[in-house]
Amino acid sequence: MTAPVYDYSDDVMDFDEVLEHFDPVMGMEVHVELATKTKMFSTSSAEFGDAPNSNVDPCSLGLPGALPVVNKLGVEWAIKIGLALNCEIAPKSRFARKNYFYPDQPKNYQISQYDEPIAYDGYLDVVLEDGTEWRVEIERAHMEEDTGKLTHLGGADGRIHGATASLVDCNRAGVPLIEIVTKPIEGAGERAPEVAKAYVSALRDLVKALGVSDARMDQGSMRVDSNLSLRPVGTTEYGTRTETKNINSLKSVEQAVRFEMQRQAACLVNDVEIVQETRHYQETDGTTSKGRPKETMADYRYFNDPDLPPVLAPAEWVEEIRATLPEMPWIRRARIQEEWGLKDEEMRDLVNAGALDLVVDTVEAGAKPDEARSWWVSYLAGKANEQGVELSGLDITPTQVARVASLVNEGKLTTKLARQAVDGVLAGEGDVDEVVAARGLEVVRDDGAIEAAVDEALAANPDIVEKYRAGNKKVTGAIVGAVMKATKGKADPAQVNQLIAKKLS
């Protein structure tokens, strides 16, 4: 009797219970869009965000007779990524046609690489939250072209199911991609979700450092597919895997792996068949939902593209590219940690929060390292959490944060007023100085007004005055609070404390 096919159920297994029975095996596939000016096989612009179907040409539309021409810079950047991932670079690689029908694929095949990728057998060492280092082995990194983009209309969740119409934008068709595929990641156990997140984070940092991609997961220039299967503890045979597609944030990577472990475990203990399929990650509740059956390699009918010659990468050219590699992110982190005098856990907090580059840019814009860290890791991290976005997705720049810090140092803003200024920038009210002026946030400089507020607060709190004069100097906080309330937070606390001490001496 055939086991029932499992789609989705809220009856997932408790995560700790999963680990008692099963070991997870993961595989990560990450697509990185290269930031070249033109497409991989034609001269059309690869600019993101242009009007739909404005960056198209006969080749990216798959018109009869159109012939592809390889973008040399795309090949160079593919080699650069391979070298940074400690891969072997193939002296000769080939493009192949991956055949499948989908409306966003005008040619009905995708130019990719199959059995002769440009880079293979590498690794990337990643650091987990507690400082543990984990080596993720790379199977291959290969070149291919991106597909177009579909916009589904009429459905409840923007997906094709339930849609009444679909719009095709071919601007993205032909944009150069590098797909980076890991070898099976085994032995991670309870840390599998964390390892997946750390790997994607490290890979994102790497390609950004290389200058080959902005790696914006929210815009699709870096897209993550996670493959996962479970096997009983103590066994070695792989289970049936599922592939969760197009995960678009680090948090979602972790949640998708965790949920799929719990879902598959519930299937296995209830004798429900796990189908090899693609699944969609649901941002709203952190679950995955059924997609389509997963094709095998044979289904794609790969064959060498007859319109494209082999890609040759002589050793001399590879070494020239190697010489252009920038400081790697892990080396840069060690240097910054030493220069700023940070403890290991302080540096990990910066990296785990996705704040390191933002803090570095804020320091370069004029802020002190401790000021920049404080803003990004505490207050702005809280704002990002409230909005459900990553730090880099906030509508404030490092230059603006540095300006806020400067105004605090100049005594023109208190910390409380500075936070209000930041809130205004995040709300789209303008640049820092515009928000300060529009909201009237600058610290009050009228000595007479502040002194009057101090006198009023002292008169209203004779018991505090008495305690102070009896030797308890810590009671002035209530007086300072009253003055700040009277001045709507615009008085300089240091000036207020000086006035209080002077009047009570």
Curated annotation (Swiss-Prot):
The keyword Cell cycle does not apply. GO terms for molecular function: asparaginyl-tRNA synthase (glutamine-hydrolyzing) activity; ATP binding; glutaminyl-tRNA synthase (glutamine-hydrolyzing) activity. The keyword Ligase applies. Its EC number is 6.3.5.-. It is an enzyme of class 6 (ligase). Allows the formation of correctly charged Asn-tRNA(Asn) or Gln-tRNA(Gln) through the transamidation of misacylated Asp-tRNA(Asn) or Glu-tRNA(Gln) in organisms which lack either or both of asparaginyl-tRNA or glutaminyl-tRNA synthetases. The reaction takes place in the presence of glutamine and ATP through an activated phospho-Asp-tRNA(Asn) or phospho-Glu-tRNA(Gln). This is Aspartyl/glutamyl-tRNA(Asn/Gln) amidotransferase subunit B. It comes from Corynebacterium jeikeium (strain K411).
